Amino acid sequence: MSHNTFGHLFRVTTFGESHGVALGCVVDGCPPGLALEADEIQAELDRRKPGQSRFTTQRREPDQVKILSGVFSDDRTGGRQLTTGTPIALMIENTDQRSKDYSEIRDSYRPGHADFTYDAKYGIRDYRGGGRSSARETAARVAAGAVARKVIPGITIRAALVQMGPHAIDRTNWDWEQVGQNPFFCPDAKAAALYETYLDEIRKDGSSVGAVIEVVAEGVPPGLGAPIYGKLDADLAAAMMSINAVKGVEIGDGFAAAALRGEDNADEMRAGNDGRPRFLANHAGGILGGISSGEPVVVRFAVKPTSSILTPRQSVNRDGAEIDLITKGRHDPCVGIRAVPVAEAMMACVLADHTLRHRGQNGERP
């Protein structure tokens, strides 16, 4: 299996399966001399780990990260653990697998999952929890994102769940402080209360629901990205689309821009106090011509409902026989909830990569 690595200069390779011994990542290209401790990575993993509320899978994984390489400390570093510029290997052990839950689907294809497509491509698949196609893999991305944030300390990255099923938040109630105060990473307290009742009903029905996640990066300097095939928004779209269950991505106003007139969509400018243009709007989501404008970079993506549900679905098995299939196991009723910290991590990795690429071509400008 190839294509387990992304990035150009800040490169992340993830490894592992849902029910394997461990999963993790190797981060290559991180500059030397950056302070990096395991507890900083752990803080990000703790936001994503399962079993923290009744609204996520009840699989209970501590997700304890181990730094295997790429850091060093002694008296000359003042006791601080610093990156050395060599590959940083991070490992997270799996401790709460229940593979027996999946024995009945060994030769069956779960609707909406990658069972059939993995079989069609490789002729073999790890059916236990979805193997490599499981959202469990995203724990490694979150770990890598914690390293990426060290490369871009001046950039603030935050994400939130802004829609669950048909219920979108009221944007006039947006409060970033609320994101950490409810189990949905929701910036609207009223919407979070609604989601609690709504998702309880979904869970009782043995069903699932989709979501929309919005991730915002502030403090991004103008100039990151490149024309045509190195566009910042193209790389961000690819990064977000690579997250499990994501089926659509938009930048800035995205698809809503199609309904606007040109004068409504224009990000007009006036002279700023720092000698740079001051934008009067940000319909473009902080990216123009594939290059960052200095405005907040705004990305949204849609997450489909979790495919594993408790009502019978029509399918077939490897022999071509038609079957009715109920998916057992422990699953998220809304996988979009735990996609929030994953979105931040992917934004961080892409921006770290583009920061290093920009420096390589243009020095420290901007």
Curated annotation (Swiss-Prot):
Enzyme Commission numbers on file: 4.2.3.5
SUPFAM superfamilies, A to Z: Chorismate synthase, AroC (SSF103263)
GO biological-process terms attached to the record: amino acid biosynthetic process; aromatic amino acid family biosynthetic process; chorismate biosynthetic process
Obligatory cofactor(s): FMNH2
Residues annotated for NADP(+) binding in this entry: R48, R54
Example of a GO cellular component annotation carried by this entry: cytosol
Cofactor note: Reduced FMN (FMNH(2)).
Pathway(s) per entry: Metabolic intermediate biosynthesis; chorismate biosynthesis; chorismate from D-erythrose 4-phosphate and phosphoenolpyruvate: step 7/7
Keyword ATP-binding in annotation: no
InterPro entries: Chorismate_synth (IPR000453), Chorismate_synth_AroC_sf (IPR035904), Chorismate_synthase_CS (IPR020541)
Function: This reaction introduces a second double bond into the aromatic ring system.
Similarity annotation: Belongs to the chorismate synthase family.
Family annotation (NCBIfam families): aroC, PRK05382.1
Subunit: Homotetramer.
Name by which UniProt lists this protein: Chorismate synthase
Organism: Methylorubrum extorquens (strain PA1)
Gene that encodes the chain: aroC
